[in-house]
């Protein structure tokens, strides 16, 4: 049986705990596979913009499955081959609910990630490395009003990264 395709996750698989460094052995393995004619795919929960650094470092990735499968991108021309975007009406409804609570969340849409200053400031308080946070901010687009994002893009997914304990029960209703 010949291997035709290799797909790898990013966080915790391709990169280490710092979310940034790709071990040399992984770079060599992916490039060796490419030399043998094997298709290389990154499959990640990240947006394409937040995965661009890893794709560039490897230099041998053919396709990216992004936002937990919401879109598949052909990296030859950056075109979306297939997608499963969230319903616009439902997305607006979700944002209206989110805005009632002090939630830390990201919007992934049109191959990019979007965050508020509030989300970024709260991420800085987490245990993520400062170097990653600096990189993260350059790859995410800041918004003032999430409705501007969801009304003008194709939303792939939301990441709710922090929910205060006092809000959990109310959100389940």
Which residues fall in each region the model found?
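Active-site phosphate-binding/coordination module
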Residues: 24-129
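An N-terminal domain-start capping segment
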Residues: 13-21, 129-135
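Conserved acidic, metal-coordinating active-site core of Asp-based
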Residues: 101, 108-173
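Flexible loop residues that form catalytic
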Residues: 11, 69, 163
């Amino acid at each position: 049986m010949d291997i035709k395709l290799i797909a790898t996750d990013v966080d915790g698989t391709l990169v280490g705990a710092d979310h940034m460094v790709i071990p040399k052995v992984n770079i060599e393995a992916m490039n060796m596979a490419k030399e043998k004619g094997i298709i290389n795919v990154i499959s990640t929960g990240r947006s394409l913009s937040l995965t661009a650094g890893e794709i560039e470092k490897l230099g041998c990735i053919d396709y990216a499955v992004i936002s937990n499968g919401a879109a598949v991108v052909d990296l030859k021309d950056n075109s979306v081959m297939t997608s499963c975007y969230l319903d616009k009406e439902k997305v607006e409804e979700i944002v209206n609910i989110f805005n009632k609570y002090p939630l830390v969340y990201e919007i992934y849409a049109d191959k990019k990630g979007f965050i508020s200053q509030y989300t970024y400031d709260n991420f800085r308080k987490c245990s993520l490395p400062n170097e990653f946070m600096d990189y993260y901010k350059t790859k995410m687009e800041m918004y003032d009003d999430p409705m501007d994002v969801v009304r003008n893009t194709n939303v792939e997914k939301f990441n709710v990264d922090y929910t205060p304990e006092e809000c959990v029960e109310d959100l389940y209703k």
